[in-house]
Amino acid sequence: MELCFNEMTVMKNGTLPEDIALCAQAGFSAVELRKGTLLRYLRGGGTLEALRQTLEEQHVRAASLNALESVSFQTKAGGRMLRELSEWCFAACRVLGCGCMEVIASFNVPEGISAAAICREAADSLLRLSDAAADYGVRLALEFMVMPGSSVRTFAQCAEILEAV
């Protein structure tokens, strides 16, 4: 068993390198990086290469990057933005040695859409993303969200979508 730290639990209390060092000190061998924290680190002058070095020095593995959100029911413009963001995330994962990108289905489902249609759309979205992710050696993990408006709210829904993929 591997202890993995979910960075979401401290997302505003420190810097990414500090979080990684604290993970190592607490005995965690892996960390689930948060996309927002990674972007804040990079905007502050950090680099992906420096972060990878920090991970290596601390003997902490980047287990996953959380998350590409609203991957289903995209408009044309939203789909283009999602493709650009996903390519960047997959490239970042490759640099960081992170083999998994979490994805979250849409929160904006058109009125009257059936559960079967949600399943098909989410499965199709995962298939489109998985082709690009594979080019970077990245796997996708579908995360369900038990929140109002979420189109995928249960483990059973995730399993059904993955069966359709």
Annotate each PLM feature:
Residues 6-10, 34-38, 67-70, 106-108, ...:
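Active-site beta-loop-alpha junctions enriched in small/polar residues
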Residues 1-15:
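Boundary/entry segment of secreted carbohydrate-active catalytic domains
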Residues 5, 23, 31, 55, ...:
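Conserved, mostly hydrophobic/aromatic
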Residues 1-3, 60-63:
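Transmembrane beta-strand segments of Gram-negative outer membrane beta-barrel proteins
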Residues 29-35, 61-65, 101-102:
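Short, well-structured secondary-structure segments
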Residues 17-36, 96-97:
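Catalytic domains of carbohydrate-active enzymes, especially glycoside hydrolases
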Residues 32-56, 105-114:
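Glycine-rich, proline-tolerant flexible connector loops at the mouths of alpha/beta enzymes
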Residues 17, 54-57, 74-165:
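Active-site acidic/histidine proton-transfer and metal-coordination neighborhood
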